[in-house]
Amino acid sequence: MESSKLLSLLRECTNSTKSLRRIKLVHQRILTLGLRRDVVLCKSLINVYFTCKDHCSARHVFENFDIRSDVYIWNSLMSGYSKNSMFHDTLEVFKRLLNCSICVPDSFTFPNVIKAYGALGREFLGRMIHTLVVKSGYVCDVVVASSLVGMYAKFNLFENSLQVFDEMPERDVASWNTVISCFYQSGEAEKALELFGRMESSGFEPNSVSLTVAISACSRLLWLERGKEIHRKCVKKGFELDEYVNSALVDMYGKCDCLEVAREVFQKMPRKSLVAWNSMIKGYVAKGDSKSCVEILNRMIIEGTRPSQTTLTSILMACSRSRNLLHGKFIHGYVIRSVVNADIYVNCSLIDLYFKCGEANLAETVFSKTQKDVAESWNVMISSYISVGNWFKAVEVYDQMVSVGVKPDVVTFTSVLPACSQLAALEKGKQIHLSISESRLETDELLLSALLDMYSKCGNEKEAFRIFNSIPKKDVVSWTVMISAYGSHGQPREALYQFDEMQKFGLKPDGVTLLAVLSACGHAGLIDEGLKFFSQMRSKYGIEPIIEHYSCMIDILGRAGRLLEAYEIIQQTPETSDNAELLSTLFSACCLHLEHSLGDRIARLLVENYPDDASTYMVLFNLYASGESWDAARRVRLKMKEMGLRKKPGCSWIEMSDKVCHFFAEDRSHLRAENVYECLALLSGHMESGQ
């Protein structure tokens, strides 16, 4: 009678500090009454200790109660460890069980052990346990066999997984769910749907789990029609109010760009889980609709659901995509007001948002308060500086990251190498290459492409070619980099040869490849070849030229003095006829060839279309200056002064002692600026006097 009361008390306990105190009292009472041999009480005590996360006390019960001859207790301990992802402990207990002379594993033992081997990736030992299961005669047990299916899926041994499943003499809905879920979780969404179809055709009725996984597979594959078909089955079989099924439907319709249907399903949900709210928000994130995301967040808070870090990160992503600073600041304010302990991903999302909205100072403030012992926070700063063209700061942040002892990863290296490419900072690039080698990442294809780009743009063609040859599977990007490298360093014929070789390997060039080819023609003055490739873009390669391609052609023709041909190309489309970049390129060619008539016409077009652009007035000034029309040139300068327009100062840089030092024209921010300018004046004097 006392035993039943104690068991009833243990079953009432939940995961709380108060419950833990009660459990300890019951535990003490069990010992006082001498009930150490009561198997049911012992099992219940182990289970409630695991529920309260008191693993040590659970182990203490196992070690000190006199009932280890019963496999029931061994299974309870292993199950507790397995449910809490303490897989090493699970296997340690199993090893002791195998060495126990008075107890042997049963069908309830193996699922926990199999799960542990799968989670730890112990393929060899997993196969051994499979053999032991067969020898023990439990391979026909539905739960044990389902566990083996899951284990092989974790090892990515899908054929073995299916073989075990197909050999099962008896299956139930749970075993079908196991195999379907395993394939879905391992990235095999198509196979998961195929198995779902087999399950139905075998006469098994899908339950909530089956339908949720099948809908999630449709979501991953963006297979809207199949998703709608499963939705109809959900309604027909009475699952239209199921929380998990509806959350999956909201996610599927959102990803398939059917937001109205997603919203309709969402509105009908009697109880909206956090997963459902997040799924609805993610649908609007994909469209960059930050306004709708913020509206859903407000409604979510009103209805009593606390946003998670995933919720906030998703909304910030929408704000970044739409460049909506106001909504982004609202989310940032919510994080501060709610005393939300923002994780690394929320802060990284804020940094990305502020950079995209042109608020670098705010991004730097967030970074200063962000966790800095992981690579993610540094990576977002480096990539953000790259995105706004501040190569110097990107390299500077990388140096800071290394100096504080944070180990760069693949993302770090692929982010910082383009900065070295743009700055032609070869020595810095070599230093980073050495770090990549030390990190044993030199075989990573993304890094090989980034290194190839860096060496080619820094003029080290020999090393670029070595890396190019080391890439096992050359894609369009790697070929394009080599074409660009040869073209920009005085070897246009080699560039065109590489272009032909690329096509022989069956690779179709893209717009960037053709841009590299046109650039190579431009550097070498290969006018006719350039015109041929430009005309073939649509007809042969099916590529629509963009502004950069037009700019290349204008430059090629402009250098050759074929200015009217260049002007005719600009006039071909409305998009190109008034484009500032194209007109400026042609205008520079007019200045070079002293073609004042066409140059004056283009300059007036630029001033008319871009009246607030200082560079427009500078090109006009240069035209008048080249023709010695000094009065007209002075009027342009006066106009610029009246409008408050200033030419952007020129920028130069130099590598010194593994550092990239940069400086601007008329820059006086350096502490020793006066000494620098005195030295420059002295050098200029010597040069003018011929000394």
UniProtKB/Swiss-Prot annotation:
One of its GO terms (molecular function) is RNA binding. PPR repeats lie at residues 38-68, 70-104, 106-140, 141-171, 172-206, 207-241, 242-272, 273-307, 308-342, 343-373, 374-408, 409-443, 444-474, 475-509, 510-540, 546-576. Disulfide bonds: none annotated. Residues 582-657 are annotated as: Type E motif. InterPro entries: E_motif, Pentatricopeptide_rpt, PPR_At4g14850-like_plant, TPR-like_helical_dom_sf. GO terms for biological process: RNA modification. Residues 658-688 are annotated as: Type E(+) motif. Keywords: Repeat. Pfam families: E_motif, PPR, PPR_2. Belongs to the PPR family. PCMP-E subfamily. PANTHER family: PENTATRICOPEPTIDE REPEAT-CONTAINING PROTEIN (PTHR47926:SF452). This is Pentatricopeptide repeat-containing protein At5g27110. The gene is PCMP-E14.
